[in-house]
């Protein structure tokens, strides 16, 4: 298996979480017995991904405690500019000096094991995971073009009417980068941040897709959720997490 480094983007301030976000980084919120990041790490390790890197910013000391007490082999990289620059800058902090392939994850996600399998299924190609409709609110829609029988990334937007053609699905928040893709992002990313310091990582992936194909595997019925506010947290706890827990129990790599 290709040695893949998992990079969590965990620097954000969690403003929309209100008081909860001011007290705790979103990646360290929990629904089940472990935090979102710890849940994700367990799933990654079950799939053979043991190299974990977390890009911190807001409430970084909480991640230092996590690494010291429960994830001692995780590498922490601090983004001191988390309040003034967007997630593309955090991604570049995570990718600095990296020569191998990486799996990029948003830290405020819960997801079932199939997500990891799908996004790293073809290690020779960069890949952005897509789901069917969730109705979760705040969706990011993905448009794709057909290239040699593969749906490949064209654009992303929260505006479902951005393109006249139907979107391919919804962004999940797991993106696999080949070694070549890492090199290209490290080349084009700094200029994008210089032009717009608040650039998000999604814009970097769209720019990457203009230089090489980024395939968009889709799982229509994937159990997953992003948690940006209290309403999304309640939805994830009531409707999504029970499906994820059930999927883990029956999964051949994670079942007990």
Task: Describe the predicted segments one by one.
Residues 112-192:
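Conserved core of the sugar-phosphate nucleotidyltransferase
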Residues 1-2, 147-149, 180-183, 187-256:
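Left-handed beta-helix
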Residues 27, 73-75, 152, 213-215:
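Conserved beta-strand segments of alpha/beta enzyme cores
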Residues 10, 56, 106, 130-131:
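Short beta-strand/turn micro-motifs composed of small residues
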Residues 1-22, 251-254:
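N-terminal nucleotide-binding beta1-loop-alpha1 segment
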Residues 23-38:
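Short catalytic helix/loop segments, enriched in acidic residues and glycine
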Residues 1-8, 34-102, 193-195:
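Conserved N-terminal catalytic core of the sugar/cofactor nucleotidyltransferase
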Residues 100-110:
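Short beta-strand-to-loop acidic/aromatic patch adjacent to the donor-nucleotide binding site
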